[in-house]
């Protein structure tokens, strides 16, 4: 049985966590106490332990590490958790060393497979010695055997206050991923066999689409749902980064107790997918691995990133944080802090560096208090819902590689959804993503679409391709009276035809509640204005809370310019906010480095709530200054 999420420290407090990289030792109890005390004194709410071999930082004098999963290692986990409990910090653990899951505890028959046979992919940078195969993420039995092998060593760390077990992003060899039992399952589902068509499964768009759909559906059940079940059996929560897998990301994120996004390798608008999944599934927390690689990746030989290594500026960090808050994040996990004794020199190879020697150490208490305050507010009530926008899963699965000019480190395929964002015309409607599995749960009520506890005024689709199962649900919802915006007529993806597809399209074309534009319906946007800033809204007890990010947050992408947050004057954004049938004219004024929290009541009152923290003005470099002048 799943533990009560209300007992999770990250639920009880909105203070940010940090990833805690255990790299070089020695790993001594007094140093564990030293770092946890420092975190507690600087506004952190917990840690997430992660173990890596720091190949980027050779230290011949470093003592041997405790044996992976050995008695000493397990005892250190137990001590860390007990002391974290004692001082009121949360303590989570990555279920493995490195990512994705794998290592010496993976049986040969449980190792990852491809369309061509055994996968050559191996873990790089694992804490342990010995074989490092990647786990077969398409086999529930393989995942359970892997977890069973690790569970005894993790048991001392899982005692006491409930912890989360963390699954990092799925950086798999996803272009060829397979499992032997899928040959027959694929034929049963699609009516033909893939043997002899392997090259077509990689190159023919519609066959490749069906291959990816098969892999994604299998991974949803065999990995994400199974992982959550394993966590619950161990008395833990599942905190999961589902991105990097060809699944329906909404379903994959919704399988976790705490869906987790990341930025900045994924742009801030990407976080709306995890936040939408949480809203649809009734999850309270949306966490983010935050600030990673903010100016680039030093480990990839990026000279520009190396120039700013360990020189991170609080104003830039706050601008990125505000961008994430405006897309639904309400729990931060700093990336990250290396294990260090007093005066230690261990460091991770990408930003940011958290610790007493951080460039921004003096700002941490105030900045973390700001994150705690805003995240706490963004947990009140429930996410505001107005417009459900169909996530273009089919469009992205049919495409292949990310164009070179759009590629960021680690980005490979369009189905990763890194660049997907709701259409601009939907911005004022506070759009939430939706996909086929959640359409199946939906019902029509007085023209609205109701999914669980979420009620939308309309369903919006603007896709080139739509699976027959999804179109069937859209037609059903239309018959139930749901307002539907069908911007263009979709086409059926895949190799097989469906005799009912044309009929569903015809029924939609004839339905009076199906239109080609939002303007055809009397659905009021939440916010209107010449320039709507990035925002997120939550509703409860007759009021609306809106976090409105500084408009500069809309420009945050990888990599940020050094000092990109520089702002010398206020930005005025007059908007009209319509809530409860009442419109409010609000003159938003964003002072430099500040965002706004707005409370709107149904009786027409709009109040700006004070967010105290203002970071020191950044010092830009010449490139930033010149680009801002051109802008």
Regions found by a protein language model. Give the residues of each.
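Catalytic and substrate-binding clefts that recognize carbohydrates or anionic sugar/phosphate headgroups
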Residues: 100-156
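Carbohydrate-binding surfaces of carbohydrate-active enzymes
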Residues: 12-17, 22, 28-33, 46-49, ...
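Acidic/proline-rich low-complexity IDRs
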Residues: 4, 114, 122, 608-610
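Surface-exposed aromatic
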Residues: 60
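Bacterial/eukaryotic Sec-type N-terminal signal peptides
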Residues: 1-2, 630
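N-terminal regions that are enriched for targeting/export leaders
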Residues: 3-5, 36, 40-42
């Amino acid at each position: 049985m799943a533990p009560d999420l209300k007992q999770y420290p990250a639920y009880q407090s909105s203070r940010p966590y940090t990833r805690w990289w255990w790299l070089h030792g020695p790993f001594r109890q007094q140093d564990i106490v030293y770092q946890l005390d420092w975190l507690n004194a600087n506004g952190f709410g917990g840690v997430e332990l992660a173990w890596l071999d720091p190949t980027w930082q050779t230290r011949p004098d470093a003592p041997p590490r405790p044996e992976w999963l050995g008695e000493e290692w397990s005892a250190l986990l137990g001590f860390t958790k007990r002391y974290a409990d004692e001082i009121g910090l949360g303590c989570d653990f990555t279920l493995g060393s490195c990512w994705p899951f794998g290592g010496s505890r993976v049986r040969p028959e449980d190792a990852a497979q491809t369309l061509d046979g055994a996968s050559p992919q191996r873990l790089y940078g694992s804490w342990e010695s010995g074989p490092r195969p990647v786990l077969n993420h398409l086999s529930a039995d393989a995942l359970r055997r892997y977890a069973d092998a690790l569970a005894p060593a993790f048991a001392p760390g899982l005692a006491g206050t409930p912890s989360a077990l963390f699954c990092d992003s799925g950086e798999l060899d996803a272009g060829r991923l397979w499992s032997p039992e899928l040959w027959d399952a694929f034929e049963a589902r699609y009516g033909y066999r893939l043997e002899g068509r392997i090259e077509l499964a990689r190159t023919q768009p519609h066959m490749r689409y069906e291959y990816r759909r098969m892999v994604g559906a299998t991974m949803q059940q065999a990995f994400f749902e199974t992982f959550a079940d394993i966590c619950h059996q161990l008395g833990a929560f599942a905190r999961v980064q589902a991105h990097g897998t060809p699944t329906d990301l909404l379903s994959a994120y919704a399988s976790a107790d705490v869906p987790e996004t990341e930025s900045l390798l994924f742009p801030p608008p990407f976080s709306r997918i995890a936040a939408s999944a949480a809203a649809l599934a009734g999850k309270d927390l949306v966490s983010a691995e935050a600030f990673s690689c903010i100016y680039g990746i030093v480990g990839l030989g990026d000279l520009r990133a190396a120039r700013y290594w360990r020189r991170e500026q609080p104003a830039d960090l706050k601008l990125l944080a505000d961008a994430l808050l405006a897309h639904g994040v309400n729990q931060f996990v700093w990336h990250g802090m290396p294990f260090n004794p007093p005066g230690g020199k261990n460091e991770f190879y990408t930003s940011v560096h958290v610790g007493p020697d951080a460039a921004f150490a003096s700002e941490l208490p105030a900045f973390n208090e700001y994150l705690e305050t805003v995240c706490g507010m963004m947990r009140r009530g429930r996410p505001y819902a107005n417009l459900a926008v169909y996530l273009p899963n089919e469009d992205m699965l049919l495409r292949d590689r990310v164009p070179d000019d759009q590629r960021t480190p680690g980005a490979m395929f369009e189905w990763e959804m890194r660049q997907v964002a709701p259409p601009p015309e939907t911005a004022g409607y506070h759009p939430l993503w939706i996909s086929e599995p959640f359409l199946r749960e939906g019902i029509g009520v007085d023209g609205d679409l109701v999914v669980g506890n979420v009620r939308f005024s309309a369903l919006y689709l603007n896709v080139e391709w739509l699976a027959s199962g999804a179109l069937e649900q859209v037609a059903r919802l239309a018959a139930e009276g749901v307002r539907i915006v069908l911007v263009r007529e979709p086409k059926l993806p895949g190799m097989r035809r469906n005799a009912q597809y044309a009929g569903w399209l015809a029924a939609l074309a004839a339905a009076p509640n199906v239109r080609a534009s939002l303007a055809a319906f009397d659905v009021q946007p939440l916010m209107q204005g010449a320039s709507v800033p990035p925002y997120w809204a939550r509703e409860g007890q007759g009021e609306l809370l809106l976090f409105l990010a500084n408009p500069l947050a809309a420009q945050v992408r990888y990599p940020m310019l050094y000092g990109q947050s520089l702002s010398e004057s206020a930005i005025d954004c007059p908007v009209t906010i319509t809530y409860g049938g009442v419109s409010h004219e609000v003159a938003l004024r964003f002072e430099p480095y500040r965002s706004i929290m707005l409370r709107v009541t149904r009786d027409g009152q709009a109040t700006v709530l004070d967010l105290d923290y203002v970071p020191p003005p950044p010092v830009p470099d010449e490139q930033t200054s010149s680009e801002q002048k051109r802008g």
